[in-house]
Regions:
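C-terminal lobe and pocket-closing loops
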Residues: 299-305, 321-325, 332-419
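Hinge/lid segment of periplasmic solute-binding proteins
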Residues: 93-96, 107, 111, 118-176, ...
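Helix-loop-helix "hinge/cap" segment bordering the ligand-binding cleft or interdomain interface
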Residues: 138-148, 156-227, 239-272, 335-341
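A local structural motif
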Residues: 46, 73-91, 110-112, 190-197, ...
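Structural recognition of the beta-strand scaffold that forms the well-ordered cores
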Residues: 49-52, 85-86, 116-120, 167-170, ...
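Extracytoplasmic/periplasmic substrate-binding proteins
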Residues: 58-59, 66, 253-345
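Conserved N-terminal structural module of periplasmic/extracytoplasmic solute-binding proteins
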Residues: 2-126, 144
Length: 420
């Protein structure tokens, strides 16, 4: 795991790219081929170790998994099994470094110290699923029929190079454009989602609207970085081809469009998550729009802070210039777990139980990985997002998720995207 590729680091050296790939293959070979032979029967352990980078999955399990009891901030109980949460933030790659070091010791670790379940993100999922440290989902006794209602892209992201599914997610993360309703009414004369979409339907139209927004005193986006995910999700080639770094035409279009907007004073160059970038979450920030999936509304837009646009239900949602996805969390069973039955049950309940899925949508405003649940909620007129002024955005999420193309996903995405 220590030599697994975490990205291309901006290097265009052919040897470097080739060596990174061989490192993945070497690690998989060295770890053995026991994953396919893992015994999920017999006596199970009394300590269940979960590795993750934030509180999101912990809150989902606490709130929605039947029988989960919270003991303290890092401990829970499921029946007579003690659940231990090992939460390491992702800053400076700390989570992956900690996970890698622990997985290297997995085979020789004491039963109560073995990782049972760990989480991965889309940008680096292949780093883990292309090794034997992740269990094939089928080896847990989970069938294709069990997962039939899940969105295909969520399976593609955690399918290894041999076509074996190695992880499952409870959520989907299709993205949309969130716009400031007051700014839309003031500048465009309407805050109706269908009407606003006409002003952001493609990048040329989006850029024209940016000029109109500037004239009215608004930035189109808080930063050029707000649009990067949308462009990078719509590439027609991979970051590394034939052992060489490749910059897709759509990435270069982001560069040229962003420079044009910045030079015209229609956006800024703030880093995502920084204080300056967040100013647009408030009316005085004078920002027209942001891009994001369902989790962005809950975790990133200061919706719980009095005086923010979200607190007052002042955002609206519309599809925007192109469909995209951003983030998502996948559950992986760790090879060597002595709690395979519990791993299986958590995956099945948290990612396939339609009642639990709907409960997550209602209570957490999440977009869940269950087609029937999402289609039912999208048609439910009683479901409204407070942050979005009572709008039900689920139908546009449903439409967006079906169009996602992950054919150009690669193990180099995290590093190359971050360096670029």
């Amino acid at each position: 795991v220590a030599t697994m590729v975490a990205g291309c680091g901006g290097s265009s050296d052919t040897t470097s790219a080739d060596n990174s790939n061989s490192g993945v293959a070497a690690t998989a070979t060295e770890s053995g081929s026991d994953a396919a032979e893992t015994d999920t029967t017999g006596d199970e352990g009394k300590v269940f170790n979960i590795y993750c980078w934030n509180e999101e999955f912990k809150s989902r399990l606490t709130d929605h998994y039947p029988g989960y009891e919270e003991v303290d901030a890092t401990t829970g109980k499921i029946g007579d099994v003690t659940v231990k949460w090992n939460i390491t933030p992702s800053d400076d790659n700390a989570y992956q470094n900690n996970l890698d070091a622990t997985l290297l010791k997995q085979e020789s670790a004491a039963a109560d110290d073995k990782i049972d379940l760990f989480l991965v993100e889309a940008d680096y999922a292949l780093k883990y699923v292309d090794t034997d440290y992740t269990m094939p989902i089928a080896d847990l006794g989970i069938t294709d029929a069990d997962l039939a209602n899940q969105y295909q892209y969520t399976k593609d992201i955690v399918t290894d190079s041999n076509g074996v599914l190695k992880g499952v997610s409870w959520q989907g993360c299709p993205g949309v454009l969130f716009y400031n309703r007051d700014a839309a009414k003031e500048v465009l004369g309407t805050d109706d989602p269908d009407e606003v979409q006409k002003y952001v339907s493609d990048w040329d139209t989006f850029n024209d609207t940016a000029e109109t927004m500037k004239a009215a005193g608004y930035k189109m986006t808080s930063s050029v970085n707000d649009t990067y995910r949308v462009y990078s999700n719509n590439v027609t080639s991979k970051w590394v081809e034939d052992g060489k770094i490749n910059i897709d035409d759509n990435i270069m279009k982001w560069v040229s469009d962003s420079k044009e907007l910045y030079d015209a004073g229609e956006t800024e160059t703030y880093e995502l998550w920084g204080d300056d970038w967040k100013k647009g979450f408030y009316p005085e920030g004078k920002v027209f729009c942001y891009f994001g999936p369902a989790w962005f509304v809950n975790f990133s837009m200061a919706a719980d802070t009095e005086g923010s646009i979200g607190y007052n239900g002042g955002w609206g949602a519309t599809p925007g210039p192109q469909g995209f996805y951003w983030g998502g969390t996948w559950i992986c069973g760790a090879t060597g777990t002595d709690n395979a039955s519990l791993v299986k049950d958590i995956i099945l309940k948290m990612t396939t139980d339609e009642t639990i899925m709907k409960d997550i949508v209602v209570k957490d405003d999440d977009f869940v990985n269950n087609k029937p649940a999402m289609e039912a909620m999208a048609a439910d007129t009683s479901y409204q997002s407070k942050v979005l002024g009572g709008q039900n955005p689920l139908s546009m999420y449903c439409a967006s998720v079906e169009k996602l193309d992950l054919s150009n996903l690669s193990a180099y995405d995290q590093g190359c995207n971050e360096e670029f």
